[in-house]
Every structure is written in structure tokens, then in C-alpha cells.
From Swiss-Prot:
Transmembrane segments: none annotated. Belongs to the POMC family. One of its GO terms (molecular function) is hormone activity. It comes from the Eukaryota. One of its GO terms (cellular component) is extracellular region. This is Melanotropin alpha. The modification Valine amide is found at V13. Keywords: Acetylation, Amidation, Hormone, Secreted. InterPro entries: Mcrtin_ACTH_cent. About 50% of molecules were found to be acetylated on the N-terminal serine. The modification N-acetylserine is found at S1. It is found in: Secreted. It comes from Camelus dromedarius (Dromedary).
Length: 13
């Protein structure tokens, strides 16, 4: 899931 936890690094991982 692409939540805020994925986007904390600046890229969707």
C-alpha cells in the first residue's frame, strides 16, 4: 500500500 509510510523517503517504494 502506498501510504505516507512509503512516501517518507520521497519515492513510492
Amino acid at each position: 500500500s502506498y501510504s505516507m509510510e512509503h512516501f517518507r523517503w520521497g519515492k513510492p517504494v
